[in-house]
Amino acid sequence: EYLNHRINAPKTTVTVDGYTNDWDDIENTDALFVGSASQAQMTLRAAHDDENVYFLLSRSDYFLQDGDTMTVCIAAGAAADYRVTVGVDGIRSIEYFANGVKQQRLTGGKAAVKVLGTVGNNDDRDEGYVAEIAIPKALVGLTGAKCFKVRPALVNADGSGPIGDTLTGVSAFSTALWPEIVLD
């Protein structure tokens, strides 16, 4: 009942380098979790400063593939959101959706990814990957915001076809039930 309901994002500046040491110094360890549809799982942590919102996405995945992605959906109203998608090579896209339809592709932000394994080699057992992301608040409508709603999602490309996974009981088309991130 209390899992994935809301988390706090402490105010701090994060160096986006793929190392998690900045996050180790933050006493707040609030995270959202996704990981029931396949063996791949992810957590999302958040922080912010005056200019950026930061996300630390940690993915556990035994078989890393190029198609393995993680997406942070940032609500922009009742039926609209910004979708920041990262892969093993960094930011793949930042897109604005309204009523489930892509409206616009945006540029901006930065990501650093640390891969713990061998992408595309299923003969070994990988650990997963970590993505550290900085997105300008102005790019995703968060300038001056005190909180926002978010929906983390992943795609696992193991096996015969990609498997999508997100929070249980939420819709990609309505942000009403998405958990909130409070900007401390």
Functional labels for PLM-detected ranges:
Residues 1-184:
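Structural preference for beta-rich elements and adjacent junctions enriched in aromatics
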